Amino acid sequence: MQIVNFYNLPTKNLSVIAIKAWVVKLASHYEVQIDNLTVNFIDKKQMLEMNQKYLNHDTHTDILTFDYGNHQVINAELFVSEYMCVLNSKENDQTLENEVLRLISHGILHTLGFSDKTQD
């Protein structure tokens, strides 16, 4: 089974079909399967509250990953900060679409066991 859902995409220019294709391609590259992946785009306030509640960080972040899988099967919820997504895209001179793909990829890599501190 392969379920990929998106909620509150930050722009209508984003193609859900294209993002799903990117996610499937990334999973295939790492030779893992997708069981269920939910990507939620949330506002600045919601992200700060979640970061405080779940990580005890009193700062903003661009993505939180809740992994329920086993590094071979992706079963996760990603929470992407719409605010940070827009900010990052401007600061890095990228389109919003590219930044969305980067952040989703970042979250998926967390489900595969990569951490922000990994040298790879």
Give residue ranges: language-model regions.
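An acidic/histidine-cluster motif and surrounding catalytic segment
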Residues: 1-101, 109-120
